Amino acid sequence: MQKEALRYLQNAKELLSKTAIEEGIYVDKKYVKSACGVAYLGVLEAINAYLLKRGVPKKDLPKKVEEYEKALKKYATIHNGKLPRLFDALYEELHIAGYYRGMLHRVDTVRSALKGAREFIEKLK
């Protein structure tokens, strides 16, 4: 359900509110990493809900990023051919750069990534 995916984004914003900002940069990267991870989970939750609505059995939902890419190409390209590319960008920004490597520090960069996640989720109605 899209509502649940958006709740993940709200949780990500709450995590970010726990760290100070100095000169446009988040001070505590632990909260930034956590927020990026939670936001990415929201994206995955939205895809799962979309696939379930399209008749994909719960046991057949994707478990790896490559499987999510294939599922989007198979089920969502008809409605919006840009979704697989947007998903790839969110995977790289939120999961890899933000969560896994902890490379996102600037407030505007993180906010832009969260905005992109929200837009992606809203396109999966």
For each feature predicted by the language model, list its residue ranges.
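Terminal alpha-helical segments
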Residues: 1-125
